[in-house]
């Protein structure tokens, strides 16, 4: 590598966002791809303009691979000890099959877990007093506990040793993964062995657990190829698939939640905390039977606020990654040749902050998508939904590889914000710590502290 390229690559760790934004202004607006150097993803990335989004998502997996690009980020063989979680992504198929339509089944258990965790993290009002909490860590514990109900059931969701281990694994998966995996396995492996035993002895008509772990076992048991079935039913591989599911779910949902609450601290004059409280209170006052999927769906203002946070802040400046796997490379519609092994993607943060797609894009408007939803245009209203992906909203991806868990994520985000505002007052002693760009990712300021107090 030439010295100039080495220096450029090193600088990309902290300047990638700036370079992509500059390239977007100079090239993407002219419908031209451009290249940025990257130390974290050798040797460089090709950034496509928004006009090529459809071309990207319609490309064959054998030409532009989603899974190979993902593996370059998560290093599945080293971080999770298996490449099968991506070459045969059963957990993705299962999440798409069960979670999109299963929210109502989980709602009572998820709400109970949310309230219990908030009692522990933010106080239960007995005695009623203000307390200081680390915002990022407390929200991470809340999200992790709620997701655990859906992934592994209530027993492990309430096991604090397991919750501590799985949270550490999610945060530090690339650092001390061997030790952390052992801690998780010590709790998860006995449950897997019990489930495998019970599944083999289960009689027709008998009830069985309804969570990700059981769905995995059922799917693996139904594989027709005996050799594949034997491999997939190895308990260690089941652990790996569960860990991967946590990794792609908990941290990203928590970042979105943290960004949403942090925006409230940066824009206190807008008083979004009270806005969300008022909406949630009105919905529950109509019917005191508690949260249902139908009621969560009515949190339009909260949903708009979360989606605007994702648009305005986001968590990455380069998304919709694909890796060129065609041996001879591929040619884009404008004639640009991409050699084998090239990583391409879209400048998501720049697109989300483009006035052509979002009027006054550089200003935060928590009601932006509520206004669109209340418009007379049916297509515009549907596009305002948090779970709606498009060429101009890429937070959950787009096309056939759009995030399959986004429906559960949306419900969790809305539910947490509603419950927090209903149950607590919040004070910002100082503005939230600024997040920082590292490579193509936005890292939350994890030292932000807020004061919270249970409402009367």
UniProtKB/Swiss-Prot annotation:
Its main location: membrane. Pathway: Secondary metabolite biosynthesis. The keyword Coiled coil does not apply. Its EC number is 1.-.-.-. It comes from the Eukaryota. Heme binds at residue 403. The keyword Oxidoreductase applies. One of its GO terms (molecular function) is heme binding. One of its GO terms (biological process) is secondary metabolic process. It is an enzyme of class 1 (oxidoreductase). It is a single-pass membrane protein. GO terms for cellular component: membrane. Coiled coil: none annotated. It is found in: Membrane. The chain crosses the membrane at residues 243-263. Keywords: Heme, Iron, Membrane, Metal-binding, Monooxygenase, Oxidoreductase, Transmembrane, Transmembrane helix. Its cofactor is heme. Belongs to the cytochrome P450 family. Cytochrome P450 monooxygenase; part of the cluster that mediates the biosynthesis of a highly modified cyclo-arginine-tryptophan dipeptide (cRW). The first step of the pathway is perfornmed by the arginine-containing cyclodipeptide synthase (RCPDS) avaA that acts as the scaffold-generating enzyme and is responsible for formation of the cyclo-Arg-Trp (cRW) diketopiperazine. AvaB then acts as a multifunctional flavoenzyme that is responsible for generating the cyclo-Arg-formylkynurenine DKP, which can be deformylated by avaC. This is Cytochrome P450 monooxygenase avaH. The lineage of its organism: Eukaryota, Fungi, Dikarya, Ascomycota, Pezizomycotina. The gene is avaH.
């Amino acid at each position: 590598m030439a010295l100039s390229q080495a220096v450029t690559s090193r600088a990309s760790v902290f300047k990638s966002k700036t370079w992509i934004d500059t390239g977007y202004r100079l090239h993407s607006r002219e419908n031209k791809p451009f290249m940025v150097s990257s130390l974290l993803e050798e040797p460089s990335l090709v950034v496509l303009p928004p006009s090529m989004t459809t071309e990207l998502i319609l490309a064959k997996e054998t030409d532009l691979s989603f899974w190979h690009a993902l593996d370059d980020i998560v290093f599945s063989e080293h971080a999770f000890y298996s490449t099968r979680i991506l070459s045969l992504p059963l957990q993705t198929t299962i999440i798409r099959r069960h979670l999109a339509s299963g929210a109502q089944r989980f709602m009572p258990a998820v709400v109970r877990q949310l309230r219990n965790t908030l009692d522990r993290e933010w106080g239960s009002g007995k005695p009623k007093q203000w307390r200081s909490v680390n915002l990022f860590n407390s929200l991470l514990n809340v999200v992790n506990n709620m997701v655990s109900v859906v992934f592994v059931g209530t027993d492990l969701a309430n096991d604090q040793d397991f919750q501590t281990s799985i949270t550490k694994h999610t945060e530090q998966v690339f650092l001390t993964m061997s030790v952390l995996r052992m801690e998780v396995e010590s709790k998860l492996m006995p449950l897997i062995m019990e489930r495998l035993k019970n599944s083999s002895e289960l009689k027709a008509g008998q009830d069985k657990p309804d969570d990700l772990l059981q769905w995995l076992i059922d799917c693996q048991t139904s594989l027709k190829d005996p050799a594949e079935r034997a491999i997939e039913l190895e308990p260690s591989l089941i652990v790996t698939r569960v860990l991967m599911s946590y990794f792609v779910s908990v941290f990203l949902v928590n970042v979105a939640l943290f960004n949403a609450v942090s925006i409230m601290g940066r824009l206190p004059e807008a008083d979004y905390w009270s806005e969300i409280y008022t909406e949630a209170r009105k919905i529950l006052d109509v019917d005191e039977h508690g949260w249902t999927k139908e009621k969560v769906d009515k949190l339009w203002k909260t949903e708009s606020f979360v989606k605007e946070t994702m648009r305005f802040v986001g968590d990455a400046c380069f998304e919709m990654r694909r890796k060129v796997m065609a041996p001879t490379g591929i040619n884009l519609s404008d004639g640009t040749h991409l050699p084998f092994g090239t990583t391409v993607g879209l400048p998501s943060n720049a697109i989300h902050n483009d006035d052509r797609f979002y009027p006054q894009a550089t200003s935060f408007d928590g009601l932006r998508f509520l206004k669109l939803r209340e418009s007379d245009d049916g297509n515009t209203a549907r596009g305002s939904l948090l779970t709606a992906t498009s060429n101009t909203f890429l937070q959950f991806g787009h096309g056939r590889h759009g995030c399959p868990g986004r429906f559960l994520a949306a419900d969790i985000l809305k539910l947490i914000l509603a419950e927090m505002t209903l149950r607590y007052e919040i004070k910002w002693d100082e503005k939230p710590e600024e997040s920082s760009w590292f490579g193509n990712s936005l890292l939350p300021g994890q030292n932000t502290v807020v004061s919270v107090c249970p409402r009367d």
